[in-house]
């Protein structure tokens, strides 16, 4: 069974990648989508590109089902940009793993400078074990089967994630949702669903999924679809 098939068997519906709202313009502008840090121009990099302690500059870091909100919060605190302060989470179709090679890590890939990263993606189900060596807390009995034992576990996707595999954009409030909508209209791309889910951008989701629950994700209604 391939790593892709193992994730599908656990009903994993998506990968997640967070980025600054201002970066979304670069991502939506071309079919290349999300580009690995090593290929990004220096002037468009931000804190989560620069601080790549895992050394995997040719890979795009993603998490499974929900974002690494702990690292996201750290990135927000470390960000010296006082003008462009908003972040979003991109939802990635699992089918990207059919066209891109990948590695995985049972924890944050930067832990111990990447020592926990594994190249044999067929063994990705290890991240769902009752216990993983790099994480002190065991898996809870009610935990959603699609979520890894350590919420910071990662899938590293080679080179880039083409725009066609971005299936959703999660934001923290209505104001950001409207700006994301405006970006999509400006670039004239097919509608990518937008969800408002503050619990997903915080670490609140972690406690929920350990009890078998999901945080609420409210669909943003495109203005032209709202009945007057």
Please provide the spans of the model-predicted regions.
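Active-site-proximal loop/hinge segments that shape catalytic or ion-binding/gating pockets
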Residues: 1-61, 67-228
């Amino acid at each position: 069974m391939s790593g892709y098939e193992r994730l599908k068997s656990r009903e994993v519906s998506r990968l997640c990648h967070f980025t600054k709202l201002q970066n979304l313009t670069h991502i939506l502008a071309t079919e290349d989508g999300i580009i690995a840090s090593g290929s990004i121009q220096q002037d468009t990099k931000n804190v989560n590109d620069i601080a790549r302690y895992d050394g995997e500059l040719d890979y795009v870091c993603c998490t499974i089902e929900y974002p690494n909100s702990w690292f996201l919060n750290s990135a927000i605190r470390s960000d010296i940009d006082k003008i462009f302060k908003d972040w979003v989470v991109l939802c990635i179709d699992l089918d990207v793993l059919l066209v891109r090679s990948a590695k995985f890590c049972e924890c944050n890939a930067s832990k111990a400078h990447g020592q926990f990263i594994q190249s044999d993606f067929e063994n990705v189900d290890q991240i769902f074990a009752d216990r993983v060596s790099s994480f002190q807390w065991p898996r809870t009995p009610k935990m959603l089967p699609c979520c890894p034992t350590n919420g910071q576990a990662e899938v590293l996707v080679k080179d880039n994630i083409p725009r066609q595999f971005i299936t959703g954009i999660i934001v923290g409030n209505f104001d950001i949702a409207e700006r994301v909508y405006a970006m999509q209209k400006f670039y004239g791309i097919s509608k990518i669903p937008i969800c408002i889910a503050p619990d997903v951008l915080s670490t609140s989701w972690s406690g929920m999924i350990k009890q078998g629950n999901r945080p609420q994700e409210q669909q943003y209604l495109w203005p032209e679809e709202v009945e007057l």
